[in-house]
From Swiss-Prot:
Protein name: Signal peptidase complex catalytic subunit SEC11
PANTHER family linked to this entry: SIGNAL PEPTIDASE COMPLEX CATALYTIC SUBUNIT SEC11 (PTHR10806:SF6)
Species of provenance: Yarrowia lipolytica (strain CLIB 122 / E 150) (Yeast)
Family: Belongs to the peptidase S26B family.
Regions of this protein lying in the Lumenal compartment: 37-172
Stretches assigned to the Cytoplasmic side: 1-15
Any one Gene Ontology cellular component term annotated for this protein: signal peptidase complex
Region (C-terminal short (CTS) helix): 158-169
Transmembrane parts of this sequence: 16-36
Length: 172
């Protein structure tokens, strides 16, 4: 028979507080990293093979956005209005125009530059408005789990089931 006494409730509350502490600590670390790196997304997972062989699918990129100028050859992550997924590509050309830097990018594994990604509105990216950050480091394949969760429903539901089963078993 299951005992739902005061001890069981106390144990459940302690577990919930532990989960809340882990979640809030992780969130605070991420937000602190965002402030230090001056980037809304200081960690980005590579989702496509457009930057191979430099970066593989599943690599986690560490971004820095405190420099005013980006050099040709550096890898940047940028967002375009209307697109939900940031793009990771190398700077091919750089131009100064009206006190702002304009960039032309291209994936290492792509045949052509990214002008078609820019939506036909212009031929270059505005460094100040569209670049999320410059890649300063990476962790190989660490983010592959996010790709598996997004692309494989069996993996996602299997992981949720195992997590629920472990929580149930540990609760007894």
């Amino acid at each position: 028979m299951v005992n739902f006494g005061a001890q069981s409730i106390r144990q459940t509350l302690v577990q919930l507080l532990g989960f809340a502490a882990i979640f809030t600590s992780s969130y605070m670390f991420y937000k602190g990293l965002s402030i230090v790196a001056n980037s809304e997304s200081p960690l980005v997972v590579v989702l496509s093979g457009s930057m191979e062989p430099a970066y593989q699918r599943g690599d986690v990129l560490l971004l820095w956005n405190r420099q005013k100028h980006v050099d040709v050859g550096e890898v940047v992550v940028y967002n375009i209005d209307g697109r939900t997924t940031p793009i990771v590509h190398r700077v091919l050309r750089s131009h100064a125009s009206d006190n702002k830097q304009l960039l032309l990018t291209k994936g290492d594994n792509n045949a052509v530059d990214d002008v078609s990604f820019y939506g036909g509105r212009n031929q270059y990216l505005d460094r100040e408005k569209e670049v999320v950050g410059v890649v300063k480091g990476y962790l190989p394949l660490v983010g592959y789990i996010t790709i598996l969760l997004a692309e494989n429903q069996y993996f996602k539901y299997g992981l949720l089931g195992i997590t629920g089963l472990l929580a149930f078993i540990q609760g007894e």
